[in-house]
Amino acid sequence: EQCGNQAGGXVPPNG
């Protein structure tokens, strides 16, 4: 939920 689920959340970013 921290990384990848939100836009530009992580690597790779989802938005």
From Swiss-Prot:
Catalysed conversion reaction: Random endo-hydrolysis of N-acetyl-beta-D-glucosaminide (1->4)-beta-linkages in chitin and chitodextrins
EC assignment: 3.2.1.14
Keywords, comma-separated and alphabetical: Carbohydrate metabolism, Chitin degradation, Glycosidase, Hydrolase, Plant defense, Polysaccharide degradation
Name of the featured protein: Endochitinase A1
UniProt record similarity statement: Belongs to the glycosyl hydrolase 19 family. Chitinase class I subfamily.
Function: Defense against chitin-containing fungal pathogens.
Keyword match tRNA-binding: no
Induction: By infection with the fungal pathogen Ascochyta pisi.
Organism: Pisum sativum (Garden pea)
Record GO terms (molecular function): endochitinase activity
Enzyme class: hydrolase
Any one biological process term the GO annotation gives: defense response
Superkingdom field: Eukaryota
UniProt keyword Hydrolase present: yes
